[in-house]
Amino acid sequence: FEIEGTKVPYAFETYAWIEETTEDIFFEWVPICEEGITVEKVFWPGEMELEEKKNDWYTLLNMQQGVLIPNDWETELTAIPFDGFFETAGGYMPWFSQFKGRNGYIAICTTPWNAGYQAEHPENGPYTHVGVRFEPSLGRMDYKRVVRYTLIEDGDYNDACKIYRDYVREQGNLCTLNEKAARVASVDDLIGCSFIHKGIKTFVQPESDFFDPENPDKNNNLTPFAVRTKEMKELHELGAGKLYLHLDGWAEPGYDNKHPDYTPACEEAGGWKDMKELADTMQKQGDLFGIHDQYRDYYFAAESFDEDYACRLTDGTIPTHKRWAGGQQSYLCATQAPHYVKRNFREIEKNQIHLDGAYLDVFTCNEGDECNNPRHRMT
C-alpha cells in the first residue's frame, strides 16, 4: 500500500472459491503482514444488488426476535442494536439472507467472533442493502475471516433457516430444545408459563447518569419480599396458571449495584428469611422462581473491586462509565466471572433458596469483551 506517498508493508489476500460438492461459495480475507497501518474495519465481500421496489423481494436479519424487510417496506431501518455485531441482540445468529421472489441466498459468517453486519433500508424502499464487516481482535486482524454464501432456488426464508440449522449441526453446535430438556429437565417446566418481571430494591448512586437530583423520590424504591409473596399467592388464587417470576434487585446493594459483590438478600426487604418464603411459595404453587444477576458490569463500589481484573485495552487503558444505577464501573474480564458465580450461588444455596433459573445479564445480549491483561488475556 501507499499512503500519502509513503509505502507501507501491510498486506492481505482475498479468495473466492466454490466447493464443488455443495456449490457453496466461500469468501476469505487473510491478513499476511499487519505492519504500517492499523485496520479498524474490513468491509468485504460487497453487498448484493436488491434494488427494485417489489414486495416479494425481502431481507432477513437476525436482529432481536428477527426481522423480515420487504423492499417496499414503508418504515426506514434505523440504528441496529450493538451496531449489528454478530452474537448480540443486533445479530443473535451470524447470518443474513435476501430473496428476489423465490430465489435468494444465505450468507453465513463462519468466523463471527469479531464481525457484524450493516444494513440500510430507506422509507418506502426501493432497496435494502446488507453486508458483512470484520473488526480487529486486540488491535490486530490476526486470523482468516470467512463468509459462506449458499444460493437458494425456489425457496423462501424457511429454507434459509434450515440451511443455517444444518450448518450448525455439521459444526457439532446444534442443541435443540429437546436436547436441552434431556440435560436439564426443568426446561420443559417452562412450557405454558406466564413470565412476571418484578423487583425488590432500586438504589441509584448520586454519580450515576440515571440519578435525578430534582426528583429524589424517583431514584430509590423498596418492595418487601412479603409483598411479592402476597402478589404471587393472589395470582395463583385467581387462576393465573403456571408462572415464572423473574426477580430484580433482590440483594442488599439493589438493582445494578456493586456487582459482583451482590449478596446477601436485601435486609430491608426481609433478608434471606423472607426471600426463602417467596421461593418456597412459588415451589409449593407449582410455579417457577428465578433471579437477575450480573457478572459483566464491574462496579467500583464493590468491596472486592480490583482494577487488575477489569478488561484492559491494547493501549493499557480500562474502559469505564457511570451509565447504570450503580455508578462508576468498568467491565469484569469474563475469565474471572466463574469464580464470582460459584461464590455467590454457594451463598444462595447455603440459605436454602430454591432457584429454578437465573438470568446472568448481559452475556447473551451484548458484544463479547476482550482483555489484553497478560495475566488473563481473553479474545
Model-derived regions, located:
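Carbohydrate-recognition beta-sandwich/jelly-roll modules
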Residues: 1-245, 250, 267-269, 285-288
